Amino acid sequence: MRLLLAILVSICLVPCHAADAWLTVAGADGPGKGKRVVLVSGDEEYRSEEALTQLAKILAARHGFDCTVLYAIDPATGEISPNTSDNIPGLEALRTADLMVIATRFRKLPDAQMKEIDDYLKSGRPVVGLRTATHAFNLPAESAYHHYSWNQQAARMPQGFGRQVLGETWVAHHGAHGKESTRGIVAPGASGHPILRGIADGDIWGPTDVYTVRLPLPEGCETLVLGQVLTGMEPGTPPVAGAKNEPMMPIAWTKHYAVEGGPRGRVFTTTMGSSSDLAAAGTRRLLVNACYWALGMEDAIAASSNVDVVGTFTPSPFRNNGYVKGVKPADLR
């Protein structure tokens, strides 16, 4: 009898321990009711574990989406560890996801985890990529999914997930890193795009610098926002004179993708997206609107929709190894 009881208890406990590796946020009432968004974090510098947690809470509490946030987890401690590049538990959630939001950097995931991402992409479901997702993966040559690596040159998917799905891979810092912040300027002819409802020049701002992208972007990309390089780290600082803003680099665009002949899916990419970038309401609105658009819900985008932060949000400054130590996903509820 005691043995049976012990077995039953252990069976009951397994799902609880597994679920502790990610965060689930149930949607309230709202246009997104019934839609499932999976947000995949995991970068060493820009605090995607903070940014995507807050974005998920906004999408759930303000807009009704059911959200699951996945993290880089140290398997020895169960703690969020962005420096652990080979473990993001819970990617099975992508099997039933309507949207993937991704903000990873140079991940070396095992084949079993990459298969979940590959299956999702082959289904043609939508993708929203933030900041370092342009160089989301750095997989070893022996990986079955090496073709998703940011710098691989094989004909199968040259420059990997970044270039082939999002529209660009890692190139360089265009603004001076940690010295020149970014102001968002609506691209010429883009003001009528539904993602930009409620967004004007200067509403989007972040302390992260503009990334270099190669111009023109690949065929089919529609630039929505340009990044004005500023002389300092405050929203009101003037723009840098000269070549850095002539022309300005795209920092947000849309496109469609298809993986190896599969169905086409919608993509929104922004090279912004650190947790500190989300301090600006315009940046939060850009991301929320992009999720609606990616899901084909652009008719539900309201210029005055609620993008207020949920709970306490004190983003950490971006820097390598700057994550808050000792935090487990359950601590973020």
Language model: regions and residue ranges:
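Bacterial N-terminal signal peptides
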Residues: L4-P15
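Extracellular ligand-binding/catalytic regions of CAZymes and related secreted enzymes
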Residues: A19-K35, E50-A51, I58-R62, T231-R333
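Helical hinge/lid and interdomain linker segments adjacent to catalytic or ligand-binding clefts
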Residues: D20-D29, V38-V40, E44-F137
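Catalytic beta-strand/loop cores that center a nucleophilic Ser/Cys/Thr
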Residues: W22, A60, D66, T84-S85, ...
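A structural signal for well-ordered alpha-helical segments within the folded catalytic domains
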Residues: K35, E49-T53, N87-I88, R95, ...
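Hydrophobic/aromatic beta-strand patches that form the interior of the parallel beta-sheet core
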Residues: V38, T68, V128, E222-L226, ...
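A glycine-rich, often tryptophan-bearing local segment used as a flexible ligand/cofactor-contacting loop or short
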Residues: R107-G198
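Catalytic metal-binding/acid-base residues of hydrolase active sites
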Residues: P126, A133, V229, G273-S275
